[in-house]
């Protein structure tokens, strides 16, 4: 969870963080492919204002596409909860967005889980660090 930070959150920040973490928690409780919730806190730790810790029931070496999608939903549910309650976005979901983007990108570029592009692995090179550039080049070849 990271080291506890000493700064004190305002009541407004605590409430917003609680809604954010509740979003993660509710999604994890309701999605079959999500890992079970182990611990939830709104005590700031590391870079996070709050943490919802999920721990798998067993060690696993493989995940189904639906389990990955459920994991993506859980990652994005904190931001969704904030948006539903406050009708505005904050920077608090930065790590969630980074992790969701990385996982979604791997679904397409490494695991062939794109219905549109098909079962192909697109290895990213240093010359084309952005997914769109690499796939755009491949699309032009097919045209």
Question: Each predicted region: which residue ranges?
Answer:
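Hydrophobic alpha-helical transmembrane segments of multi-pass inner membrane proteins, especially
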Residues: 1-3
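Hydrophobic alpha-helical segments, principally membrane-spanning helices and signal/leader peptides
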Residues: 5-6, 29
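Short pre-active-site segment immediately N-terminal to the catalytic Zn-binding motif
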Residues: 6-16
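Soluble catalytic regions of large protease machineries
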Residues: 14-19, 25-141
């Amino acid at each position: 969870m990271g080291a506890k930070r000493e700064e004190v959150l305002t009541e407004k920040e605590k409430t917003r963080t609680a809604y954010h973490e509740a979003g993660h928690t509710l999604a994890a409780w309701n999605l079959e492919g999500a890992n079970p919730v182990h611990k939830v806190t709104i005590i700031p730790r590391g870079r996070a204002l709050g943490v919802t810790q999920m721990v798998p029931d067993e060690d696993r070496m493989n995940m189904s596409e639906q389990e990955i999608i459920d994991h993506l939903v859980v990652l994005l549910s904190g931001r969704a909860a904030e948006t539903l309650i406050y009708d505005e976005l904050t920077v608090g979901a930065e790590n969630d967005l980074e992790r969701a983007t990385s996982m979604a990108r791997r679904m397409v570029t490494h695991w062939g889980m794109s219905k549109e592009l098909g079962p192909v692995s697109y290895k990213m090179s240093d010359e084309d660090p952005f997914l769109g550039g690499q796939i755009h080049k491949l699309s032009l070849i097919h045209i």
